[in-house]
């Protein structure tokens, strides 16, 4: 799901392509030329276009007015093809003016103003593998979660460090950052709260769910 600056909600489906929901009118629009595509992630590209990743197909720019698609190459043709056929998804995030993070086998940043890519340094990267998902970002930092860890990406330094790792104790399914800057983490072992300042991790006892 992605909500654009006009309040339109873009709904990516697993094989049904892209859909548009206008909340004020409850009007729902399907784009037939995207049917059959598995939409893995969506973000802003500019006022007119969205950037999205279709699983095993690649990155595409989608024109919100015409519904037309055009391909977008990640880094270069060779690397782009390798990622498409790797079986991983690329998660995309427009985090600042003309800058987009692309989370794949590595953390890539695309600068639209220069048309260039950079790759973030991840401390002890051999321990933190697999696709990561963004759960908070602003112009300075992005927080990401992987299978059993949380990373903090510093945009100025173009480097990421691990803030928290569960190891084999739990698998992270979801995470969010609250208004106080702390994390709520949903895992296969229950709900946890992480205090960023004290680095205290506490399990939240609840009977709302088992996982």
Task: State where each predicted segment sits.
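Carboxylate-rich, polar loop motifs that coordinate divalent cations or form catalytic acidic clusters
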Residues: 1-211
């Amino acid at each position: 799901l992605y909500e654009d600056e006009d309040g339109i909600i873009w709904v990516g489906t697993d094989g049904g392509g892209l859909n548009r929901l206008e909340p004020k009118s409850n009007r729902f629009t399907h784009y037939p030329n995207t049917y059959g595509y598995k939409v893995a992630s969506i973000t802003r590209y500019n006022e007119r276009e969205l950037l999205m990743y279709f699983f095993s197909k690649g990155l595409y720019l989608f024109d919100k007015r015409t519904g037309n698609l055009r391909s977008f190459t990640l880094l270069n043709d060779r690397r782009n093809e390798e990622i498409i056929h790797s079986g991983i998804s690329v998660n995309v995030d427009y985090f600042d003016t003309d800058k987009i993070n692309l989370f794949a086998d590595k953390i890539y940043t695309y600068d639209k103003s220069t048309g260039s890519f950079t790759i973030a340094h991840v401390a002890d990267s051999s321990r933190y593998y697999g696709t990561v998902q963004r759960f908070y970002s602003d112009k300075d930092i992005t927080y990401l979660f992987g299978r059993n860890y949380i990373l903090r990406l510093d945009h100025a330094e173009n480097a990421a460090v691990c803030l928290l790792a569960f190891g084999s104790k739990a698998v992270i399914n979801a995470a969010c950052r609250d208004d106080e800057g702390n994390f709520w983490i949903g895992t296969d072992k229950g709900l946890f709260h992480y205090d960023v300042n004290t680095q205290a991790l506490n399990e939240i006892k609840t009977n709302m769910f088992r996982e």
